[in-house]
Each structure stands twice: as structure tokens, then as C-alpha cells.
């Protein structure tokens, strides 16, 4: 039977680093360094880590206090999950050991190979030629490359496979809209090295593009078209009951014809089948609707709020939102009614849309269908 909380021989110092910022009741069990054969139960509580020796008795049973005795560690953990019984807190959430993580990821890897092959997006490594690096990220680097003569972006993972990234690839494989960056294929083989191929976006991300040009090089009509491209991509997501959850200019890329496309679907999910939040999921406060930050529930209406922030970014030429407000104070300001002023020289028609997207009542915000119509109307009537 698997014991995901059993971490083997790790030091007290390493344990305290692992548990340092975890919630009360988070725990793991490690082999005792001072008493061979014994274990140590390590438990997070009020910002500290408590260490309890688990004694191995002569009858091969285990105990923390010589009163409650258990035939194995599994029953010991089950007992202290029901009742703290002398501990500082009952056991709540285990920290999964690296061995279990690796086992799960290897199983996931093999399953994904079968899944991607059936979907027709599994790519042979010999058909991919990798060129110069064009971007660096926390989880990997991005290279320019070619797949069967087609120019592509090749994402290479730094630390082997990650289930999060394979999940993102699966999500992207279901998308089909001109304003969403397209998945070309996934390279997975016996080497356990993973590459994800997407369409090549020659003009990079929208933040860098806007900052390098500025208001004197870009006409307002071009800015509005960027916004309409994004709204159209999100109209497709909305129609398919999908939410992006990380909509921001940094995740908007421009192709060779300066068409804006939404990228980075690492946090995206179905409204009907929401995923549980993993520890790697940190939502960007300045772009996320307050009700989503409070409840953890995301809808198309929360994406609409984020789209309003994108409008502000576009017409401020990629300034950081909520300037001069500390990030820890942003939510409080919004809940008290504060909204950003429109950027300098922003058309009234655009600032009116921003105001609608930031309505405190999600039901009063426009849909992406309505936003597309508004932007198309602004372009047609030259309301800029």
C-alpha cells in the first residue's frame, strides 16, 4: 500500500523548509536520523514545524506517546487525522513524497503518450529541428524550430516532465480558433524528454511590442484591433464554456501579420469540470476579479474583468496596472469602490467598456460576444 506522506531519510532542516509556508495540519513522516528504525512525524502549526518521535516497539508496533499503539504507520496516520490526541493539530494534508510523485508522473507520461497518439498530435523527434533560443521561463526555455519544414516554437522543459504542462497541451489540443495560439504537436518518447510545439509567433508578446513602440508609432485603430483579436479568442472560449484564468498582455502573442493571439493555457479549465487548484497555481492579483480571488470560482465573467485590465494595458502601452498601489492593497481598494482611471489619450468609447467590465456584480458585465460587437462598432463608426 502506498504511503504518500513517507519521505524516507530527509533531514530536519530540509523538512522545515518543505513545511515552512504550509497550512496548519500539513504533515509528513521521515525516517529518524537519531534513532534508527524509528520515524519522526513533522507537523505544521502556526508558522512552526513540530517534530514528534514515532517509536518502533519490540512487537513491531508504532506509538508517539506509549498510550495509543498502532500495528503500522497507516493506522497511526488515520488515527491522528480523526483526532489530534495530544498533537498540536490533527493531521490534514500530506506533503507527497518525491518517490510517489515520480511514480504518478511516469504513469501519467505513458498514459499521455497513448492519448496524444490517438489525438494525432504525437510528433516524432527526428522530424523536429531546434534552432536558437527565443525565450526563457521558470519551467523551461522556448526555441525557434522547424517541424517538417513549418516554423514552430519549441518549448523544452527544464526539469523533465510535469503533469501541469502535459495537461496544458491536452487542453490546447481541443482549441480551434484563429486568435488562440495553436498546438502543433507534442514530442514524447522513451527518453522522458518532452517538447511542446506551437505555432511560431514572429512578433513576440504584446507587452514588449507596446513598450518598444509607444503612442507615437502605433495608431489607435491598431490598438483596438489587438483588443478585438483577444475578445474574439475569448468569445470562442466562452462559447465552449472554457475559462482562461490568466488573461493578461504578457500572455498575448503577435504573429507575423501582427494578429494578436491568446497563449499560456496553464491555468485554463472547463467551467463544467473545474480542476482543483495545485500549489503551483498562483493567480495574478492585479488581473483577477476579486470574487474569484475570494471564492476560487472562475467564470467567463471573471475573464471579462481581466479583459478590462488588458484594455487598460493596451492603451497605457503596457504599464503595470494599479500604479502606485501596493499589491497587497489592491483587493481592498477595489472592494472599497476604486477603479483605475483610463490611460492618457484613451478613447472614451474604450474607457466606457473598461468601466462595464469592472462592475462589482459579475452578472452586469458584458459577455465576450457583446464585447466583440462593441469593439467592431467602435471600428466601424471610428469612435476613437
Provide a role label for each language-model segment.
Residues 141-159:
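Glycine-rich ATP phosphate-binding loop
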Residues 1-138:
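Domain-scale recognition of modular recruitment/scaffold domains used in eukaryotic signaling
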Residues 185-187:
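A short, aromatic-enriched beta-strand patch in the conserved N-lobe beta-sheet
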Residues 165-170:
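Regulatory alphaC helix of protein kinase catalytic domains
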Residues 190-199, 203, 207-208:
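A conserved loop-to-beta-strand element in the N-lobe of protein kinase catalytic cores
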Residues 238-255:
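Catalytic-loop of the protein kinase fold
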Amino acid at each position: 500500500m502506498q504511503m504518500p506522506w513517507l519521505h524516507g531519510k530527509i533531514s530536519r532542516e530540509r523538512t522545515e523548509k518543505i513545511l515552512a509556508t504550509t497550512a496548519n495540519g500539513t504533515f509528513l513522516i521521515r525516517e529518524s536520523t537519531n534513532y534508527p528504525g524509528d520515524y519522526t512525524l513533522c507537523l505544521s502549526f502556526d508558522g512552526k514545524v513540530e517534530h514528534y518521535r514515532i517509536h518502533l516497539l519490540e512487537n513491531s508496533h508504532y506509538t508517539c506517546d506509549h498510550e495509543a499503539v498502532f500495528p503500522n504507520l497507516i493506522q497511526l496516520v488515520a488515527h491522528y487525522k480523526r483526532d489530534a490526541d495530544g498533537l498540536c493539530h490533527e493531521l490534514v494534508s500530506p506533503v507527497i513524497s518525491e518517490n510517489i510523485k515520480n511514480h504518478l508522473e511516469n504513469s501519467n507520461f505513458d498514459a499521455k503518450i497513448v492519448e496524444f497518439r490517438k489525438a494525432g498530435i504525437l510528433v516524432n523527434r527526428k522530424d523536429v529541428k531546434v534552432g536558437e533560443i527565443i525565450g526563457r521561463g521558470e519551467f523551461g526555455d522556448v526555441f525557434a524550430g522547424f517541424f517538417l519544414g513549418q516554423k514552430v516554437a519549441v518549448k523544452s522543459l527544464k526539469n523533465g516532465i510535469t503533469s501541469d504542462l502535459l495537461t496544458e497541451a491536452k487542453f490546447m489540443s481541443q482549441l480551434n480558433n484563429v486568435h488562440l495560439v495553436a498546438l502543433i504537436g507534442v514530442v514524447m518518447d522513451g527518453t522522458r524528454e518532452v517538447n511542446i510545439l506551437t505555432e511560431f509567433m514572429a512578433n513576440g508578446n504584446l507587452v514588449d511590442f507596446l513598450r518598444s513602440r509607444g503612442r507615437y508609432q502605433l495608431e489607435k485603430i491598431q490598438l483596438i484591433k489587438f483588443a478585438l483579436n483577444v475578445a474574439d479568442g475569448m468569445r470562442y472560449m466562452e462559447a465552449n464554456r472554457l475559462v482562461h484564468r490568466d488573461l493578461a498582455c504578457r500572455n498575448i502573442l503577435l504573429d507575423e501579420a501582427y494578429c494578436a493571439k491568446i497563449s499560456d493555457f496553464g491555468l485554463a479549465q472547463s467551467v463544467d469540470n473545474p480542476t482543483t487548484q495545485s500549489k503551483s497555481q498562483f493567480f495574478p492579483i492585479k488581473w483577477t476579479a476579486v470574487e474569484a480571488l475570494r471564492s476560487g470560482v472562475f467564470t467567463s465573467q471573471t475573464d471579462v474583468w481581466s479583459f478590462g485590465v488588458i484594455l487598460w494595458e493596451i492603451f497605457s502601452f503596457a504599464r503595470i496596472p494599479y500604479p502606485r498601489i501596493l499589491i497587497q492593497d489592491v483587493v481592498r481598494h477595489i472592494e472599497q469602490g476604486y477603479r483605475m482611471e483610463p490611460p492618457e489619450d484613451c478613447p472614451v468609447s474604450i474607457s466606457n467598456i473598461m468601466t462595464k467590465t469592472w462592475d462589482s456584480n459579475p452578472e452586469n458585465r458584458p459577455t465576450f460576444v457583446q464585447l466583440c460587437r462593441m469593439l467592431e462598432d467602435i471600428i466601424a463608426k471610428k469612435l476613437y
